[in-house]
């Protein structure tokens, strides 16, 4: 028997690290995250594997604009884990809202300055500062790999986390 739940993995809003994914990178990550593990605190250990993503979708919220003035979109993941005695407490913590926040481990080809378009670090602009009213952040472009999603205490992306318990058996 399996337990399923959905996640907001990442979005195109500026995060706590002053970075944001572009929509194309989120779309690519959607394909790359299928089959990836859910672990804890980005600790890459087979012992920590608790869940696995079996499906993703890019969700667009046309009614909400990001700091950059673009329609908000996010990568929604669907994950499963086995209903075992060892996972009983984790499932209870997910259902109770204790284990809620998540973060993703991934790679992108480029991080571009939102002010001038140069590779981040090759210009004088600093992430988190405003220039003529525009917030400087790193635009994360051209996703190349997805490693895992992790349950964490404080995610870089404030809205990332378990969305709701999905329940019984998924169509894998």
Q: For the regions a protein language model found, what residue spans apply to each?
A:
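Signature of dsDNA virion morphogenesis modules
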Residues: 1-172
């Amino acid at each position: 028997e399996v337990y399923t739940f959905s996640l907001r993995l990442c979005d195109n809003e500026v995060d706590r690290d002053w970075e944001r994914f572009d929509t194309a990178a989120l779309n690519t990550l959607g394909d790359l995250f299928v089959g990836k593990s859910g672990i804890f605190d980005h600790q890459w250990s087979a012992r920590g594997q608790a869940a696995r993503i079996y499906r993703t979708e890019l969700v667009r919220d046309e009614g909400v604009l990001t700091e950059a003035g673009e329609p908000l979109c996010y990568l929604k993941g669907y994950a499963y884990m086995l209903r075992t005695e060892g996972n009983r407490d984790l499932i209870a913590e997910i259902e109770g809202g204790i284990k809620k926040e998540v973060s993703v481990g991934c790679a992108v080809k480029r991080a571009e300055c939102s002010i001038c378009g140069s590779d981040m670090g090759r210009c004088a602009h600093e992430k988190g500062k405003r220039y003529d009213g525009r917030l400087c952040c790193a635009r994360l472009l051209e996703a190349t790999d997805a490693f895992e999603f992790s349950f964490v205490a404080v995610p870089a992306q404030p809205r990332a986390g378990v969305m709701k318990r999905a329940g019984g058996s998924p169509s894998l």
